[in-house]
Amino acid sequence: MNDVIKHKIKHNTQRFITSMKWIVFSILSGLIIGSIGSAFYGCIKMVTELRMEHLWLLYLLPLGGIVIVGLYRLLKDENDTGTNLVLSAIHSNEEIPLRMAPLIFISTVITHLFGGSAGREGAALQIGGSIGGALGRLFRFNEKDKHIMIMCGMSAAFTALFGTPMA
């Protein structure tokens, strides 16, 4: 076999392996993060309906704020830059802590329960990016592939938030 054919076989084999890797990891991240994103959507919907039925919950908004501040202090995440951290992690080697996902999930649900103003979309991006980054670290991906996993996580959570995890 001549060298050109060997090179083409090697190159195509590497492309095939890379394609299979991303098919597996996109399905894995979609299932995990899409499920969490759907749960987030369900919780937001449930607490919003609950608040609409019990308008007196609005008076407990300061209590909800105290609980959220306590959670941030407990998890030592007082300098959280939110969605900016997730977006900057895509363009740099900055890591998104996994603790961001449950913290944002819980604090956003609490905020919506008591009638606070918090966007679901930014929260979904933070949750998905945090979990995607953690999956990238778990499987020891290089920096470029970690960035791809962060973006996969963000898109999985974002689409699940709108009730469209499967297209």
Where are these regions (language model features)?
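Alpha-helical transmembrane segments and immediately membrane-proximal extracytoplasmic
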Residues: M1-A167
